[in-house]
């Protein structure tokens, strides 16, 4: 396990502690400043609108209670948001399970109560202007305010996963006022749409709750245009208030890595050690912000922000500042690559003949992984060593020429360096004897989790009956069950696909499940690329330049792994073998020829694939001449040469 200086720091200087204090400050500013001022403004406007209908002394007496009621609404919502706020994706494989998981939860009930209370309080404050329902339609007014409006907003809140804070790798800081102003138009449009939907939903609720009432009650209500208009306006104001509170909360919680113009790690007396503790933090929000700061330092126009990385005097048993930063970034990238590859292996076609298994060329994934895990080797910290033996990929035959020097491509960069040595024979067995599989094989060839569970349940029922009738049968039951339950997904070599996945496979949701925190991956790529390019002129003799080979190697493997997922089409699960077994160069070249495939990047893994490709190209173009003196992996050199040829030919569409 890669060690970080987190344990060497005073607990109050860790990134998580400092960032927690910053979040508390932002939350307090949100409550005591923004929402308090907005409550006063809302109360003043409502009092002015109600002045023709109510006496001045009555409005004066209601002024303070109205402010407290409006403040209570905002406080209820943001406290609930704080408790359920998250930055990682939940990991649902498709939209159906996502919606069911969101709606069938305690969180949905909590929000239902919060929004119902908020709707009642807002209607009480607005009642001085729009009234609180006449004698003829008061039951419908209560139903609309207490149930319809909060339910509609709660449904859209959970379906859109409004509790998740969204970030991008382009903006590392955004002022809250700018965040809110950019979304004012969307707030208004969304509120109007939800208000109209609520009016159409109201008859359904009235049919359910007032089915035994006389029809004349509903007729007298619907025939009053003023009553319907009042409900429409009240619901719109309530939706605007709810949406503004949620947007303001998002704006203050997603400000970024700056606090009062300073980087969060600079609030500590040991900035680099604090930053490193954030990169390896357990809390996702802390890690995300730390990677934001690292990318901000790497791309900033101010070289003083990168000077501590170049010249930090901090050293530990695991290395200096840069080596620890490099370890964390490559670790983040490679873990995501491994998850993607393991998933693609899990949906492989289980078929394949013994003859075909010797004829396919495995150019990418198998040299990185063995049995779904990153391979390891006793390699140096930076760079790779050539090996006299390497897995052969041509016609399944080993090249026994002792004078042929081949490049080893099965070692992982800076990961699993302390693992035990593997058996070499198992690697060759994978290439020669493993059943050839395709990533887009029909999922109906798999035994689903549902069918496996049903089979085991029936067998357990049979064992129970047999044990009751024949007591001696019980002696074998426990051993049989332990053997049978190995067939479940967690202990199986056979890929298990849930029955819901058969009905509805969402590539976007699957990408969110595989890479739940893509912004950390993206900021890792941005940070490594920025530091490599900036250090060429700012620190030409430093250690960052020496790691260009390892970074290019990791990016090339990302292009292979993430590119496989970008090419994967769950709607047509029938790719040919040559479409799935391609090198990174083949993958990038076809994507450059097919503009549509580059534009259709709705899932985050495809976006990360394009980002990795762009970063690889930018580094290669920047280090063009210097790469001649750097040892490069064979696949890295091949892809780099192809990029340079394309760039020299002046074909912009190819890149």
From Swiss-Prot:
A Pfam family of the record is Ndc1_Nup
Q: Which residues carry this modification: Phosphoserine?
A: 401, 412
GO MF terms here are: spindle pole body-nuclear membrane anchor activity; structural constituent of nuclear pore
GO annotation, cellular component aspect:
cytoplasm; nuclear envelope; nuclear membrane; nuclear pore; nuclear pore transmembrane ring; spindle pole body
Where in the cell is the protein located?
A: Nucleus, Nuclear pore complex; Nucleus membrane; Cytoplasm, Cytoskeleton, Microtubule organizing center, Spindle pole body
- Cytoplasm among keywords: yes
Bilayer topology annotation: Multi-pass membrane protein
What UniProt keywords are attached to this protein's entry?
Cytoplasm, Cytoskeleton, Membrane, mRNA transport, Nuclear pore complex, Nucleus, Phosphoprotein, Protein transport, Translocation, Transmembrane, Transmembrane helix, Transport
Q: Does the keyword Translocase apply?
A: no
**What ranges does the Cytoplasmic topological domain annotation cover?**
1-33, 80-88, 131-190, 246-655
Main location group: nucleus
Q: Which GO terms describe its biological process?
A: mRNA transport; nuclear pore organization; nucleocytoplasmic transport; protein transport; spindle pole body duplication; spindle pole body localization
Kindly list the residue ranges recorded as spanning the membrane: 34-54, 59-79, 89-108, 110-130, 191-211, 225-245
Side Perinuclear space, residues: 55-58, 109, 212-224
- Its job: Functions as a component of the nuclear pore complex (NPC) and the spindle pole body (SPB), probably by playing a key role in de novo assembly and insertion of both structures in the nuclear envelope. In SPB duplication NDC1 is required for the insertion of the cytoplasmic side of the SPB in the nuclear envelope, thus allowing for the assembly of the nucleoplasmic SPB side. NPC components, collectively referred to as nucleoporins (NUPs), can play the role of both NPC structural components and of docking or interaction partners for transiently associated nuclear transport factors.
Please describe the quaternary structure of this protein.
Component of the nuclear pore complex (NPC). NPC constitutes the exclusive means of nucleocytoplasmic transport. NPCs allow the passive diffusion of ions and small molecules and the active, nuclear transport receptor-mediated bidirectional transport of macromolecules such as proteins, RNAs, ribonucleoparticles (RNPs), and ribosomal subunits across the nuclear envelope. Due to its 8-fold rotational symmetry, all subunits are present with 8 copies or multiples thereof. NDC1 may form a subcomplex with ASM4 and NUP53 at the NPC. Interactions at the SPB have not been determined.
**Additional observations:** Present with 3030 molecules/cell in log phase SD medium.
Q: Which family does it belong to?
A: Belongs to the NDC1 family.
Q: What is this protein called?
A: Nucleoporin NDC1
Q: Which gene is the coding source of this polypeptide chain?
A: NDC1
């Amino acid at each position: 396990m890669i060690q970080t200086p987190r344990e060497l720091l005073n607990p109050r200087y860790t990134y998580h502690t400092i960032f927690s204090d910053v979040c508390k400050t932002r939350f307090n500013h949100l409550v005591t400043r923004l929402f308090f001022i907005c409550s006063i403004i809302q109360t003043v406007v409502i009092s002015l609108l109600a002045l023709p209908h109510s006496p001045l002394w009555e409005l004066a007496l209601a002024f303070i209670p109205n402010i407290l009621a409006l403040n209570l609404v905002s406080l209820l919502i943001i406290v609930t948001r704080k408790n359920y706020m998250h930055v990682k994706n939940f990991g649902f494989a498709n939209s159906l399970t996502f919606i069911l998981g969101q709606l069938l939860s305690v969180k949905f009930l909590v929000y239902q109560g919060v929004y119902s209370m908020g709707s009642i309080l807002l209607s009480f404050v607005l009642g001085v202007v729009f009234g609180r329902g006449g004698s003829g339609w008061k039951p419908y007014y209560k139903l609309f305010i207490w149930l319809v409006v909060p339910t509609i907003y709660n449904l859209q809140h959970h379906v859109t996963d409004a509790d998740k804070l969204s970030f991008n790798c382009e903006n590392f800081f955004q002022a809250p006022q700018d965040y809110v102003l950019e979304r004012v138009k969307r707030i208004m449009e969304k509120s109007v749409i939800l208000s109209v939907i609520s009016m159409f939903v109201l008859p359904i609720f009235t049919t359910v709750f007032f089915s035994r009432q006389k029809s004349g009650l509903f007729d007298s209500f619907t025939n009053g245009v003023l009553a319907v208009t009042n409900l429409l306006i009240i619901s719109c104001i309530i939706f605007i208030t709810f949406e503004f509170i949620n947007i303001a909360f998002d704006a203050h919680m997603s400000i970024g890595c700056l606090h009062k113009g300073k980087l969060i790690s600079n609030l500590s007396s040991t900035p680099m050690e604090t930053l490193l503790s954030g990169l390896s933090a357990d809390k996702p929000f802390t890690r995300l912000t730390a990677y934001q700061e690292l990318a901000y330092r790497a791309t900033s126009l101010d070289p003083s922000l990168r000077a501590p990385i170049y010249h930090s005097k901090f050293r530990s048993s695991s290395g200096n500042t840069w080596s620890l930063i490099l370890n964390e970034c490559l670790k983040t990238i490679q873990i995501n690559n491994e998850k993607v590859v393991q998933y693609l292996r899990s949906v492989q076609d289980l078929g394949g003949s013994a003859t075909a298994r010797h004829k396919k060329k495995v150019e990418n994934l198998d040299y990185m992984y063995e049995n779904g895990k990153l391979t390891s080797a006793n390699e140096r910290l930076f760079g790779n060593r050539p090996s006299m033996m390497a897995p052969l990929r041509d016609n399944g035959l080993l090249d026994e020429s002792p004078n042929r020097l081949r490049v080893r491509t099965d070692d992982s960069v800076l990961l699993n360096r302390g693992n035990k040595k593997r058996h070499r024979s198992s690697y060759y067995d994978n290439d020669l004897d493993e059943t050839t599989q395709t990533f887009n094989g029909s999922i109906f060839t798999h035994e689903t989790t549902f069918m496996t569970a049903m089979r085991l349940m029936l067998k357990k029922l049979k064992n129970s009956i047999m044990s009751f009738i024949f007591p001696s049968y019980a002696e074998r039951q426990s051993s049989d069950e332990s053997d049978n339950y190995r067939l479940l997904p967690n202990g199986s070599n056979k890929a298990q696909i849930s029955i819901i996945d058969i009905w509805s496979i969402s590539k976007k949701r699957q990408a969110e499940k595989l890479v739940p925190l893509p912004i950390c991956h993206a900021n890792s790529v941005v940070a490594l690329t920025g530091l490599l390019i900036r250090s060429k002129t700012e620190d030409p003799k430093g250690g960052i330049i020496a790691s260009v080979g390892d970074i290019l190697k990791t990016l090339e493997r990302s292009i292979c792994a993430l590119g496989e997922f970008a090419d994967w089409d769950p709607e047509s699960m029938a790719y040919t073998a040559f479409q799935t077994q391609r090198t990174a160069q083949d993958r990038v070249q076809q994507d450059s020829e097919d503009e549509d495939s580059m534009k259709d990047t709705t899932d985050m893994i495809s976006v990360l694939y394009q980002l990795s490709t762009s970063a690889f190209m930018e580094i290669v173009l920047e280090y063009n001449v210097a790469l001649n003196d750097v040892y490069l992996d064979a696949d890295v050199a091949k892809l780099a040469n192809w990029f340079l040829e394309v760039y020299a030919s002046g074909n912009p569409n190819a890149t």
